[in-house]
């Protein structure tokens, strides 16, 4: 499953074909019933913070502070109740801090609440926090003997492997570039990778 349609299913309690959001190129119809709207009707204060990626603006939330599209890992831009705000830091830390701030100071402490906290971190391109850049600098992870497989007698597995290769890049997604640079990224993804790093602070 992918995150956008999964999120739409969670919000509506309906399968993707019923809620209309079948892939990440769709636009979520926010006019339909969702569980945050039902909670609002029962007196709950509702909020969503972090990854949204449903194209349309959130509905059924008293407060929302969401990443734009997939969001960026470094110095991400959010949309806070309709206004863009660029924040310095790593997406996981920034999103967590925003949630804690809302829980502590942003909500009515006398009311029950529902907070949806959606992190960027499970999503490609799986970039680490800057403090972890050197975490495995002295480590060497050799490729397993089965990394290059002939798939003899296993045609279904071969087909699945080709699907993974089509959708996931060894360098851009899986960070498998070796010291001799014998594994190369697809050219179209190199530009996307540069955009990610260009969003970082100079230091």
Residue spans for each PLM region:
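Formylglycine-dependent sulfatase
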Residues: 1-203
């Amino acid at each position: 499953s992918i995150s956008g349609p999964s999120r739409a299913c969670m919000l509506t309690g309906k399968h993707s074909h019923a809620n209309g959001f079948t892939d990440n190129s769709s636009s979520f119809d926010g006019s339909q019933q969702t569980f945050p709207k039902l909670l609002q009707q029962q007196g709950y204060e509702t909020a969503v913070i972090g990854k949204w990626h449903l194209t349309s603006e959130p509905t059924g939330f008293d407060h929302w502070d969401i990443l734009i599209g997939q969001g960026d890992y470094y110095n991400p831009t959010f949309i806070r109740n309709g206004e863009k705000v660029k924040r310095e830091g790593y997406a996981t830390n920034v999103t967590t801090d925003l949630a804690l701030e809302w829980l502590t100071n942003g909500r009515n402490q006398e009311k029950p609440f529902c907070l949806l906290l959606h992190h960027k971190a499970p999503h490609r391109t799986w970039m680490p926090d800057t403090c972890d850049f050197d975490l495995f600098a002295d480590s060497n992870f050799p490729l397993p003997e089965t990394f290059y497989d002939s798939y003899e007698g296993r045609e279904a597995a071969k087909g699945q492997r080709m699907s993974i290769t089509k959708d996931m890049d060894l360098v851009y997604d899986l960070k498998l570039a070796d010291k001799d640079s014998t594994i190369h990224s697809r050219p179209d993804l190199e530009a996307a990778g540069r955009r990610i790093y260009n969003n970082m602070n100079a230091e």
